[in-house]
Regions:
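Ser/Thr-rich, low-complexity intrinsically disordered terminal regions
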Residues: 1-119
Length: 119
């Protein structure tokens, strides 16, 4: 399983709404925004080892870029694990941690957009 994660999802919502939902998802999951470009619908956040009361074991950096896609928007999410001094972890990462954070982030983003949750 790769340590880095890349996912793209298309939503039938405008880019501004998707970006705002991403900000709320970051806040809900306890992430800290380290950079953002609201005019370009882009953010980068760092997440702690423990999220929603569950200890995952690694810090994670996640970036989300939203682009217009026809009548909706495309959310592009990239994430990777961080070491103790917040550098990209190149080896020794726990399997599944980064994927879990990306999955939770997208689930919260979709909830904030008012979309039904997947079964």
């Amino acid at each position: 399983m790769p340590f880095e994660q890349h996912q793209e999802k298309i939503y039938a919502k405008d880019p501004q709404s998707i970006y705002e939902a991403a900000l709320k998802a970051t806040e809900k999951l306890g992430g800290k925004i380290v950079s953002s470009a609201p005019d370009q619908y882009r953010l980068t956040a760092r997440f702690p080892k423990a999220i929603l009361g569950k200890t995952l074991g690694e810090r994670t950096e996640l970036s989300c870029q939203v682009r217009a896609d026809g009548t909706g928007g495309l959310a592009v999410v990239d994430a990777f694990p961080l070491d103790a001094v917040e550098r990209k972890l190149m080896f020794g990462a726990r399997p599944g941690v980064t994927l879990t954070i990306v999955t939770w982030f997208l689930a919260h983003l979709e909830h904030n957009l008012g979309l039904p949750s997947a079964p």
